[in-house]
Structure formats: C-alpha cells, structure tokens
C-alpha cells in the first residue's frame, strides 16, 4: 500500500489499520493516521521511507489481537474471522546503506504467537524500532523479538515501567 492512509478530513475521528487473515501487507507510504495499527493474523511489513522513517505515526499503537468469530469488536462491529487464535508478524524493513529508525506508540500482544522483526535493507544499512512502551502481554500470548536481520539494529522501549504495564504470565523471546 503505497498511498497515504490518513485520518478523516474533519479530524474528529482517528483512522486505524487492521491487518486480518493470512498473507502479507506492505506499507511504504507516508501515512498520517493516528489510530492503532492492529494485526489479527498474517504479516504487516512497513518499509522505511527515510533514515527517520514515518510510515506509521509516532503515537500509533501496534496491537496483536484477534477477536474470535461470533464476537463483537471494540468498535461494535461484528467480525468475520475464523474461530482461531490470533498470531501475526510485524516487520520493519530498512533501506540499503541507511541507518533506519521508525518510532511508534505502545506495543500490545493480547492473543496468539506474535513476532516483531527487523530486516536491514542491505549493505551497511540497519533497521531499528522505538516503541513508547511495552504495554500489555496477556497470558495467552507470546511475543518474539527477531533482531537477526536488523544488521545491528535495536528494538527500544523508551517509557517502559512495570508499574504501568499489564504483563500477565508473559512469554517474551529475544
């Protein structure tokens, strides 16, 4: 998806992005939406557009969560996903020979086996993600951080404290 995903024209509502079902979406436009980015299943890749990347707004939450069939979501809309566990991948892909950083809001893992992955663009390039906080990891969820393709890049949480986080019987893998 190379075009811009933006909030509505009046600015009264935040637009959110929801990746559902198997398969892969790639975002590489300069998006201005300020709602959450939700991955129910499959892979959502964001491809750096500059050294300081702006694919997703800095305050946008990244959330792994699947609402099961026959349930209503937080937006009161009936979902259409098969009755299964969630689980998805969020991948940041850097540019060749550039030090790429994407800054985001909170990271939440609420359902399924999930992975946050870094992939450098090649050459001397690196890929790094900066999240505001690791907000929630529920006990029926696992969260894997795969830095192996980041060419020395990092995943950083700038405001993480255990006092303001909902970390149940978490399973976190690096």
Q: What is the meaning of each model-derived region?
A:
Residues 27, 38-113:
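Extracellular beta-solenoid/beta-roll
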Residues 1-58, 112-174:
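Extracellular repeat-rich scaffold modules on cell surfaces
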